[in-house]
C-alpha cells in the first residue's frame, strides 16, 4: 500500500486507529482557537489532494469550527408567548460543511472556495478544513488544471451553492424519479425541492 492509502485507512475509523488519540490532543488546542484559522498544511493530506489541493503558491488551507445542531434564530424584542417566538425548531436548510465554507469565504474575501472535508468533532463542534484558491495569483492563472477558477462566473461560488457541499445540499446529486423539483433550482420550483 502507498502512503496515501495508509492515511485513508486510518481516517476511515479514527477511534480504532492512531488518529483517535491525535484528534483528542488536537481538539484541546482547537477549542481555544478562533472560529476561522489559516493553517500551514492540510491535516488529511490524502483527502486534500483528492479534492484538488496542490502544495504550490496560491493555495490556502483554512480550518473552520461550526457549532453542531439546528439554528437558533434571533430573539424578538416585542412581547409574545414563548411558543410563538419562532426561535427554535428551524433548520438552516444547509449542511454544517456548507456553512463552514461560507464562514471561510467571508473571512478571506479575495479567495475562492475549491472544496472542503471533515477533520474532527466533539459534543459541541465540528471542524472542517476548507481548500481556498487565490484566483488572481499568476501561478493559479498559468495552471490549466485550476485556471478555470479565475473566470468571472466562478466569483462567489460558495454563496451560490456551486461547491460540492452546496450541490449536495441543493439535491443535485440525485436525478430522475424523486428529483423533479431540484432542477433548474430550488427557487425556480418555489422551494418544493427542500
Curated annotation (Swiss-Prot):
GO terms for molecular function: RNA binding; structural constituent of ribosome. PROSITE patterns: RIBOSOMAL_L15E. Belongs to the eukaryotic ribosomal protein eL15 family. Pfam families: Ribosomal_L15e. It comes from Pyrococcus furiosus (strain ATCC 43587 / DSM 3638 / JCM 8422 / Vc1). The keyword Ribosomal protein applies. One of its GO terms (cellular component) is cytosolic large ribosomal subunit. Keywords: Ribonucleoprotein, Ribosomal protein. NCBIfam families: PRK04243.1 (NF003269). PANTHER family: LARGE RIBOSOMAL SUBUNIT PROTEIN EL15, RIBOSOMAL PROTEIN L15. The keyword Transmembrane helix does not apply. Residues 165-194 are annotated as: Disordered. Part of the 50S ribosomal subunit. It comes from the Archaea. Residues 177-194 have a biased composition (Basic and acidic residues). Residues 167-176 have a biased composition (Basic residues). Gene3D superfamilies: Ribosomal protein l15e (3.40.1120.10). The gene is rpl15e. This is Large ribosomal subunit protein eL15. InterPro entries: Rbsml_eL15_core_dom_sf, Ribosomal_eL15, Ribosomal_eL15_arc, Ribosomal_eL15_CS, Ribosomal_uL23/eL15/eS24_sf. SUPFAM superfamilies: Ribosomal proteins S24e, L23 and L15e. One of its GO terms (biological process) is cytoplasmic translation.
